[in-house]
Each structure stands twice: as structure tokens, then as C-alpha cells.
Amino acid sequence: MARYTKEDIFRLAKEENVKYIRLQFTDLLGVIKNVEIPVSQLTKALDNKMMFDGSSIEGFVRIEESDMYLYPDLDTWVIFPWTAEKGKVARLICDIYNADGTPFEGDPRNNLKRVLKEMEALGFSDFNLGPEPEFFLFKVDEKGNPTLELNDNGGYFDLAPMDLGENCRRDIVLELEEMGFEIEASHHEVAPGQHEIDFKYANAIRSCDDIQTFKLVVKTIARKHGLHATFMPKPLYGVNGSGMHCNLSLFKNGENVFYDQNGDLQLSDDARHFIAGILKHAPAFTAVANPTVNSYKRLVPGYEAPCYVAWSAQNRSPLVRIPASRGISTRVEVRSVDPAANPYLVMATLLAAGLDGIKNKLTPPAAVDRNIYVMTKEEREEAGIVDLPATLAQALVTLQSNEVISNALGDHLLEHFIEAKEFEWDIFRTQVHQWERDQYMSLY
């Protein structure tokens, strides 16, 4: 990541004819928000004097205490590569602060920084994330609204003409590279109209920032191609949903602490403790990793998404997989997370779960090399394999009963997250869906 000073930003804004700056942040539900300012207000923004109404943002504060401040992270300065009508537009990602100058505890980005400090207190220097976000491309109607008509009928690793999203995907990659992303690969996914673009791992804050920027770029470029990009976990019945596998690693002084050349599978004791912590707390962090009603339509057998809490060195049916790379690339892949999740909240909970395993020297169960999807319930019980929550309602109950994951969110975020998601569940469970009409109207 480039390191910028205020003087660098003033100079670049002038040299590149920047006319507007988006001061970007993320709300409780993972939705990108921004306050756009003209370049004439850049000095005020860089002096941390830009105020906004926090009571209007999901999960922030009440109307009686609404004044909040945007503190830009100078190292997130980037100029959007697409052309604006009058000058260019730049972006700064911000942390949220209270009026008294203290970090706002309801800011997901600030909260992740808090958990990272707990990691540093244990002697680790970096928590790295390599995300694999998937998305669908749908056609839009004459009014620009998304339809359910897919852009192509391609499958895994297909080429054009089966992969009609190829040009759109290439343009997304080019725009991302102009913004400083190191793209490792892009390809068509298993389901028709489904795509994946993988970018290089980075520290947790940078990677979460990148995920949010990635979503914005994907949606923007798709729209230019007359398409609608969605990160909804399961937009269509009968095909794979979209996940966001998270490849995690802990570093100490530039060394990957998960790697031990002499360990079983060349994994260190800390790696095994970390895996055990992830498995122990997986049912509790599921509400955060899979935060929508729709998320649980993806977590069903038969569609390459994990439903069971287990781990393996290669097998892709468990929740946790250990990819083959070793040395500095040794990592723990958590496969349940979906792209509707707030990345800052997910990373806080995954880190807290893994650190709990390390602090308490938890031991993971035996690795499962069988296809869990074809195991009977009795076989799973004998192997100690438990199910992930099957609904958002179940996941919320499990979250509230888990002290480690609750503490990873903090009181403010936990309270407002539970409130928002219970409200979402209540709306869903009282709706009458088309499936019910098709199933019952003629029968009864």
C-alpha cells in the first residue's frame, strides 16, 4: 500500500484534476456509505473536521447524539479510473469518531482495529486475509432494473462464447489494477452467470477495504456493460450460491507462524490451535459470516458450500480447508463466509475465534477426508461433526450465547446487529411467498 502525506494528496489532487472526493465508510450491515465533497473542502477533510449525521446510518447512534466525524485514512487515497464529466473523483476511506475525539465503537473498521490490538498484545504482528468473492451478472430491463435473466450459461472455467461475461470481467480487472489491486486470477464460476476474481492477500484492514472497493468497482463496471452485478449469496434456486472464502494467516516479524516444516502437514502448533478456535466458535460467528435470510439457502448440501463444522487438508466439503501451499503461503481457508457479510465484522470474529484457540491451546478434532455430504447423520455424530445453524434465527441465538464472538463485536455493534437482524427475520417469517401460493392454494 502506498504511504501518503497530506502534501502528497494535495499535490496529486491538483496534478490529476480531481474535482470531488468521496469520504467513504461502511455501516453496520456492510453497506458502503460516503460523503462527497468538492476539492475546495479537502483541507477541512484532511484536518478531520468533516462532520455528518450519524443517526441516519444503520447501527450508529440516536438522533440526540448524532454529530460524528470522518477521519480519513490517508493511505487509502485512490483516484477512480473511470472518467467523470468535469474532472476526476478520488476516494478516502474513513474511520468514524465521536465529537469528543474518541473512536466510535459502532464503527466496524474501528472495531476490527480494536481486535487487532488484542492480537498484537499476544505477540503477533499481522493478520492477513486473501478473499475469494463471487458474484452473479444479470441482465437489466429497459429501465435499468435487474432481471432474473442471466448474462450467460457458462460453467466452471468456461471460455467465450459460453462465458459471455468475459469482457465485463476483464474490464473489472483492468479498473482494479489501475486502482492498485494485484489481481491473481479471474474466471467463470460453477453456476451460469457466476464469476470470481481473486486478489492478493494483505493485512486485515487493507483486505477489508479492498473487498468494499471491489464490490463498488464490480457494480459500476457491470452497469456500464448493461448488466447488474449482485453479491447476494443465493439469487437462484438449484445452482451454486456465491461465497467469499477467506484465506487467513498470522505473521510474526515477517514470518508465517502457521508454518512448521517439521509439524504434521507442516502446520505449527499455533495453526492447529487457531483451527480449533475457528471450529469451536463457527456456529456463533455464522450470524456475522452469513448475515441474511438468503445466506442459509446457500448453506445446504450439494452445492459446494459447507454445512458442517470440520476441517481437512484437501477435502472441500468441510468448513475449514488447508490449501496445499506451505512456507509463507500457509493458510487456513474458511469456506462458509458469503459476500453479503460486513468484512470488518467477519474478520474481527474470525480473528477472535482463532486467538481463543491459541490462548487456550485448543486441539482440533481429527481431519475429515471423506465427503461429508454423503455421510449419514450417525456417521457425522460419531466423528464429532456438528451442523452450522440452518437459519438466520438459529444463528442469532447461537451468537448471543457465545462470549468470545460477542466480545469481538463489542456491546454497541452486537446490540444493534441483533436488533437489525431479528427485525429482518421477523419480516421474512411473516411474508407469504410465491412458493407457498404455488404449493397450497390449489391443494387446500
UniProtKB/Swiss-Prot annotation:
Signal peptide: none annotated. GO terms for molecular function: ATP binding; glutamine synthetase activity; metal ion binding. Residues 108-444 form the GS catalytic domain. Mg(2+) 1 binds at E132, H245, E333. It is an enzyme of class 6 (ligase). The record marks R62 as: Important for inhibition by glutamine. Coiled coil: none annotated. This is Glutamine synthetase. It comes from Bacillus cereus.
